[in-house]
Amino acid sequence: MAGEDLEVDGPQYVPLEIDMGVCVKPGYFYSDIARELLDVFSNRVLPDGRLGVFHPDNFSFGQPVFLSSLIATAQAVTGVESVNIKKFQRQGIDSNEALLAGSLTLGRLEIAQLDNDRNFPERGVFTLERG
């Protein structure tokens, strides 16, 4: 547009902290289930071509993260008996508000991020525990 100034705002990535307790069905090994869950909740393209839950292509500006979809995804993994989310929050902000509400809301320029990379913990952390 001639004579008009246009300002474009970039995304603001919001790192998440999620702690998930998992009970494993009899006949399955926790280590196998944990490895599968870490893959499923990754930010990578999985060997079978699926995208990990926190792959950047799965989230857009202002899109909330729903607790129910995380639980359903975990329970869909073969060998998972039950799932208990213990922490579901923005990183560094100790609050159970999103856990109680069942969703983490984001602003119009915010995008959820959870890389779970030990070298870059400031990009979100996903922790698995027994039970």
For the regions a protein language model found, what residue spans apply to each?
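Acidic, low-complexity glycine/serine/threonine-rich segments
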Residues: 1-131
